[in-house]
UniProtKB/Swiss-Prot annotation:
Residues involved in Zn(2+) 2 binding: 100, 135, 349
Name of the molecule in the record: Succinyl-diaminopimelate desuccinylase
Gene (name only): dapE
Annotated S-S bridges: none
E.C. number: 3.5.1.18
Source species of the chain: Shewanella sediminis (strain HAW-EB3)
Its job: Catalyzes the hydrolysis of N-succinyl-L,L-diaminopimelic acid (SDAP), forming succinate and LL-2,6-diaminopimelate (DAP), an intermediate involved in the bacterial biosynthesis of lysine and meso-diaminopimelic acid, an essential component of bacterial cell walls.
Pfam families for the chain: M20_dimer (PF07687), Peptidase_M20 (PF01546)
Entry similarity comment: Belongs to the peptidase M20A family. DapE subfamily.
Active site: residue positions: 69, 134 (proton acceptor)
Quaternary assembly: Homodimer.
Pathway(s) this gene product operates in, as recorded in its UniProt entry: Amino-acid biosynthesis; L-lysine biosynthesis via DAP pathway; LL-2,6-diaminopimelate from (S)-tetrahydrodipicolinate (succinylase route): step 3/3
Length: 376
């Protein structure tokens, strides 16, 4: 088996690029892409490093998308090996970012190098959109690059995001869409007082409880063939001074919707406000839009991805929309078709993160076949 993917993955993992740091990962990729005829554009916004690399000027435009930043390592004492000293043990590459997603970055780059060597006059264009702000607040990363591309009418036709989509074996699941995400920060106002004199106070916890119960029990929609029903979850709740004899003056609640294409964020907000008002609450609320739902249906990208996985691994992939958000949510609204295909996600964000070495080589082959099916 070729060592190209493994060697590059190890080089990337060895760079301690905890979000929003990049630590030279993008420059390493840029140097290799430049040697294959890519024009490199670095886009730095505040503390975030982004790279837009493109080969070709015509359409259709196929884009590999991913991130060089990783999450913090956590308790070092729980790691069997140093997280930024990548090592292969029993066929698995260990290190922070091995699965999420430096292994995918290595597979993308090597697949592209091989493809360009075989097909120097390929149809259309190939691009890389790489950020160091996917694991962080996602303010200055992919979303800013997309804004720049949109401003100059540079349109992505197909985007393949290298997020670890697989569950049990490589390619068993791809993501052809994601649910929308909407977060609410609610403050219910009351009057602080002594618990022995409740008539002189106004308990916001007691007041809010029926409304929160109604929100938690609400059936927001029925979902559809592509998306499960919309989910409402209370993520954080805080009220009180810590003393047993004080009625709190306020209650803070953070909740999140993961919503389907059957409902809009505006509809969810309206329904929440109606419930809060119906219970007569004195409240303040703010909203954070984390991403719209998107879906890539049948078409060239999904067909090429499905066929490539079958050809390389023998697996019949299952397109799904479950799980969290990804940077695909910033690309899809431009009209691009978006698919996520990456390694097994069993150890992502955990101590002792690892990925099967053989999967990285197969992933590179999948990416190469997808390029061939779309641009040859």
């Amino acid at each position: 088996m070729s060592q190209d993917v493994l060697t590059l993955a190890q080089d990337l993992i060895s760079r301690e690029s905890v979000t929003p740091l990049d630590e030279g990962c993008q420059q390493l990729m840029a140097d290799r892409l430049s040697a294959k005829g890519f024009d490199i554009e670095s886009m730095v916004f505040d503390d975030t490093t982004n790279m837009w690399a493109r080969r070709g000027n015509s359409g259709p435009l196929f884009c590999f998308a991913g991130h060089t930043d990783v999450v913090p390592v956590g308790d070092l004492n729980r790691w069997h090996t140093p997280p930024f000293d990548p090592v292969v043990i029993d066929g698995y590459l260990h290190g922070r970012g091995a699965a999420d997603m430096k292994g995918s970055l290595a597979a993308m780059l090597v697949a592209t190098e091989r493809f360009v060597e075989k097909h120097p006059d390929h149809n259309g264009s190939i691009a890389f959109l790489i950020t160091s702000d996917e694991e962080g607040p996602f303010i200055n990363g992919t979303t800013r690059v997309i804004d720049t591309l949109e401003a100059r009418n540079e349109k992505i036709t197909w985007a393949l995001v290298g997020e670890p989509s697989s569950t049990h074996k490589l390619g068993d699941i791809v993501k052809n869409g994601r649910r929308g995400s909407l977060t609410g920060n609610l403050t219910v106002n009351g009057i602080q007082g002594h618990v022995a004199y409740p008539h002189l106070a106004d308990n916001p916890i007691h007041n809010a409880a029926p409304a929160l119960d109604e929100l938690a029990r609400m059936k927001w929609d029925n979902g559809n063939e592509f998306f499960p029903p919309t989910s409402f979850q209370i993520a954080n709740i805080n009220g009180g001074t810590g003393a047993s004899n004080v009625i709190p003056g306020s209650l803070e609640v953070m909740f999140n919707f993961r919503y389907s294409t059957e409902v809009t964020a505006e509809e969810l907000i309206k329904r929440v406000l109606n419930i809060l008002d119906a219970h007569g609450l004195d409240y303040d609320i703010s909203w954070t839009f984390n991403g719209l739902p998107f879906l890539t249906g049948e078409g060239p990208l999904l067909d090429a991805t499905r066929d490539a996985i079958k050809q390389v691994t023998g697996t019949d992939t299952d397109p799904q929309t479950s799980g969290g958000t990804s940077d695909g949510r910033f690309i899809a609204p431009t009209g691009a078709h978006v698919i996520e295909l990456g390694p097994v996600n069993a150890t992502i964000h955990k101590v002792n993160e690892c990925v099967k070495v053989a999967d990285l080589e197969q992933l590179a082959l999948c990416y190469e076949v997808i390029l061939e099916k779309l641009l040859c």
